[in-house]
């Protein structure tokens, strides 16, 4: 079994490999979001980045994603506090606010199947952003789901 480094190592002290392994690969950060102009409320949509694979929930061009999507966000220990749009289920966000990893997290289960079974990932729930005319028509609530 893997050493549970996330319990003993502060986020800012993690190696790049440790940091990257915290990502559960749910794909929620790849969803387009809308901010209401009047209320500043954030809404998730099921319109995903055109690079997201709807089945694996992974980026088709991850190593070179900034070439294809310059506005893609790189989540780092330095900017995690500012990324308030990350869902509550996100391991980076959970650890930043002092929560542990949920029982379905791949670092605890050894694979992504428990995450998919818990309904946490975007698997099978998205549409390619290139096929969407109005993001407002794609607002969904399920990305906010956080299951222990």
Swiss-Prot record:
Signal peptide positions on this chain: none
NCBIfam families found in the cross-reference section: PRK05170.1-4, PRK05170.1-5, PRK05170.2-5
Name of this chain's protein: UPF0260 protein Sfri_1740
Family annotation (InterPro entries): Puta_zinc/iron-chelating_dom, UCP006173
HAMAP family: UPF0260 (MF_00676)
Top-rank taxon: Bacteria
Family of this protein: Belongs to the UPF0260 family.
């Amino acid at each position: 079994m893997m050493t549970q480094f996330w319990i003993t190592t502060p986020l800012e002290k993690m190696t790049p490999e440790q940091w990257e392994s915290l990502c559960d690969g749910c794909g929620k950060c790849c969803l387009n979001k809308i901010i209401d102009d009047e209320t500043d409320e954030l809404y998730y949509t099921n319109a995903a980045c055109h690079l997201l694979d709807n089945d694996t929930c992974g980026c088709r061009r991850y190593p070179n994603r900034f070439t294809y999507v310059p506005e893609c966000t790189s989540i780092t220990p330095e900017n995690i506090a500012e990324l308030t749009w990350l869902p509550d289920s996100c391991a980076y966000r959970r650890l930043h606010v002092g929560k542990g990893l949920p029982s379905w997290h791949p670092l605890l289960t050894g694979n992504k199947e428990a995450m998919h079974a818990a309904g946490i990932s975007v698997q099978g729930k998205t549409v390619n952003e290139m096929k969407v005319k109005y993001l407002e028509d794609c607002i969904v609530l399920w990305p906010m789901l956080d299951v222990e």
